[in-house]
């Protein structure tokens, strides 16, 4: 950090996670369609997968609000009993389901939900067939779930995503900044999140608005950090 930059306190921002806040495009239309189709799924579970920051967690929140399901992350499952996890609900969304802390907990949760006629939404980075599962019974159930991919964003969605991320942080940006970023940034959800976060932090540190020069600085710094991390 340069001497001219101020210390920035980390204040949490609250992303908008409602249905109307979700940005729909060709890359995620299938996933949105399955959420809208609930409860008329082909089986007890579906598995939504895609790259980091692609909206899996957002969709899980949307489905939770619509279905009354419980939302929990894979690492938080622990060895808890299925009725304890559900707490009276009949359905559950498991975010980061491919980063489990206890496979048996998910297996019991799956079986319990299927038995009581509920639904299970699994969200992860990879297709369920590629999850490293040791329990054969769990692997077969996950593999049988309807797999729904969220693909990398197109330019239209990427632009809309930048606008939403800036809005979530109450940052005002001009069209020139958006055009500059879209012409030069990596085409990924994670890159959009990293860029907006860096612009927010640097703008606060230097007490500057989000401008093209600030965007240029952030892109250069992120590229430098990426090159450094990629070195042996």
Predicted features by range, described:
Residues 128-143:
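Short regulatory helix/loop adjacent to the ATP-binding pocket of P-loop NTPases
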Residues 84-109, 116-125:
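Conserved P-loop NTPase "ATPase switch" module shared by AAA+ and STAND
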Residues 1-37, 42, 204, 208-232:
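A short, basic N-terminal segment
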Residues 43-59:
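Walker A/P-loop nucleotide-binding motif
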Residues 136, 145, 159-172:
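Conserved AAA+ ATPase "sensor/coupling" helix adjacent to the nucleotide-binding pocket
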Residues 179-183, 190-204:
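C-terminal helical "lid" of AAA+/P-loop NTPase domains
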Residues 64-75:
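Post-Walker A helix-loop "phosphate-sensing" segment adjacent to the P-loop in P-loop NTPases
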Residues 145-157:
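Conserved AAA+ ATPase "SRH/arginine-finger" region at the nucleotide-binding site
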